[in-house]
Amino acid sequence: MFSGNRYLTKRIHKELPLFLQLLLWNCIAELPVPKDYLQIFRLSGAGSQQIILHSQEVPPYEKRYQFAVPFSPVTAKIYVIAEYDANQKPYATMLFAEEY
């Protein structure tokens, strides 16, 4: 489902550091359970620590990541949504929750 082209909104491209973009895609790729079409990432910070809570609904999954970052931690809710185009080719889009 997440094996096709990957897209991001202009806002994700502009506001989310590339390191975090790549990390979120990797979190999806490494999921140890079947992937839901909707992946949810809640980002927050504590000092110089970035905290990411990754979840999906079906099957239920949740994992927390925490690590030091050389930039101000990002606070946001991000969706990655998997879909199929008119030719039934899979693709996924990363966007801020409020862009949905």
Please give the residue ranges for each predicted region.
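N-terminal "domain-start" segment
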Residues: 1-70
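Short, compact, well-ordered microdomains
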Residues: 60-100
